Amino acid sequence: MIWHVQNENFILDSTRIFMKAFHLLLFDGSFIFPECILIFGLILLLMIDSTSDQKDIPWLYFISSTSFVMSITALLFRWREEPMISFSGNFQTNNFNEIFQFLILLCSTLCIPLSVEYIECTEMAITEFLLFVLTATLGGMFLCGANDLITIFVAPECFSLCSYLLSGYTKKDVRSNEATMKYLLMGGASSSTLVHGFSWLYGSSGGEIELQEIVNGLINTQMYNSPGISIALIFITVGIGFKLSLAPSHQWTPDVYQGSPTPVVAFLSVTSKVAASALATRIFDIPFYFSSNEWHLLLEILAILSMILGNLIAITQTSMKRMLAYSSIGQIGYVIIGIIVGDSNGGYASMITYMLFYISMNLGTFACIILFGLRTGTDNIRDYAGLYTKDPFLALSLALCLLSLGGLPPLAGFFGKLHLFWCGWRAGLYFLVSIGLLTSVLSIYYYLKIIKLLMTGRNQEITPHVRNYRISPLRSTNSIELSMIVCVIASTIPGISMNPIIAIAQDSPF
């Protein structure tokens, strides 16, 4: 009899939960329509994988790419709609969040063609790879719109778990396994640190979890200047610093970059930065509104450390991927300037603009590295010597992307940094901007050092890898080369006409 009553209660509770979930999805589902498209793409991939013995690989790529393109289209159709909070306060939709979602989708869309030939050559499992990329993208998109502490914790964990699996995708490679273990252990530690900071916020605000309600709760409890908020700020900054690869939480980055498959590195190098930047912008600007001076100081210190250490250590690297890892640590230091400046002086607009350019510059560079690695089997910087004599197109593409990363005019990277530094200067961040300018000049040195190697024509300096290099045909249908062309064009032309991009970014108030 007791068992029968308990069983009935369980059925009633389950029915209530199901009906509540159905009600939320029915009335609030339109707010996550772009995310639903990706979920539908995931289901299709799983169905094809479970029902087909001979997997039609082109269809798998087509479904993944189409899901991303359709999701981008849904975002564009929703542009300029009124900001809305849905799912009982868990999710917020506005133009600012949608720009970051667009950037994540753009990264994923460009990374799919970069992976095709690499996966075919290395005989990696294609379905699982695409599933992890789609799921990581989904986690990043939910993070951009997250409006409460639970969603802010769960969404990046979804992204992180897929990142761990992707970084260790080549299971027979010892370096890949080592990178995965380091990434997993340090990622777990950073997540614990982050959630500990959230617990201090939750307690100090009187039990609130929504971002804006936390601010109201801190006012009601008079805890907005308490030691508890300072503790929360320190722990959350450390956790976000890991996600952004900010010094001194950057140690995992070079090992993961070197040990992971190159298309995975290309994907993680941009999507993780975009998603973590969206998280940092929201978490610092809303719950820590009353502690702006404190978190400004913390981020300034971390940005200075990242710009100096990242660019100094990059000079000494012999691996191209490790060099780009340290370069990315320096690059995120520049992005932090926009976060510190905030919305009042155009800081967020300059950050978004530079992030868009960074996506094209970085993915273009990785496309060149993937092509060179597939044709030579090496990642050593010295082995790029004389590449121009064998493949001028690849050498020029790599040179343009590196020069844009360094910030040389008239490329996109120069105008992106110029606008970012100008906004910082107007906001009074003179020392931070000065460090940014000096480290940008320093970064040009190691980029030019690589370009000098590319263009060398002396036979004694050309390595056997380049001498035996497979020259690609003039007309190539290689998907990596197509992505590379798109990224190279995006790294050069937008710098000349970037006003529309800045206008769109400024039209998305926080």
UniProtKB/Swiss-Prot annotation:
Its EC number is 7.1.1.-. One of its GO terms (cellular component) is chloroplast thylakoid membrane. It is a multi-pass membrane protein. InterPro entries: NADH-Q_OxRdtase_suN/2 (IPR010096), ND/Mrp_TM (IPR001750), Ndh2_N (IPR045693). It comes from the Eukaryota. GO terms for molecular function: NADH dehydrogenase (ubiquinone) activity; quinone binding. Keywords: Chloroplast, Membrane, NAD, NADP, Plastid, Plastoquinone, Quinone, Thylakoid, Translocase, Transmembrane, Transmembrane helix, Transport. The chain crosses the membrane at residues 24-44, 57-77, 99-119, 124-144, 149-169, 183-203, 227-247, 295-315, 323-343, 354-374, 395-415, 428-448, 484-504. Pfam families: Ndh2_N, Proton_antipo_M. It catalyses: a plastoquinone + NADH + (n+1) H(+)(in) = a plastoquinol + NAD(+) + n H(+)(out); a plastoquinone + NADPH + (n+1) H(+)(in) = a plastoquinol + NADP(+) + n H(+)(out). It is found in: Plastid, Chloroplast thylakoid membrane. One of its GO terms (biological process) is photosynthesis, light reaction. The keyword Transferase does not apply. NDH shuttles electrons from NAD(P)H:plastoquinone, via FMN and iron-sulfur (Fe-S) centers, to quinones in the photosynthetic chain and possibly in a chloroplast respiratory chain. The immediate electron acceptor for the enzyme in this species is believed to be plastoquinone. Couples the redox reaction to proton translocation, and thus conserves the redox energy in a proton gradient. NDH is composed of at least 16 different subunits, 5 of which are encoded in the nucleus. Belongs to the complex I subunit 2 family. This is NAD(P)H-quinone oxidoreductase subunit 2, chloroplastic. It comes from Brassica napus (Rape).
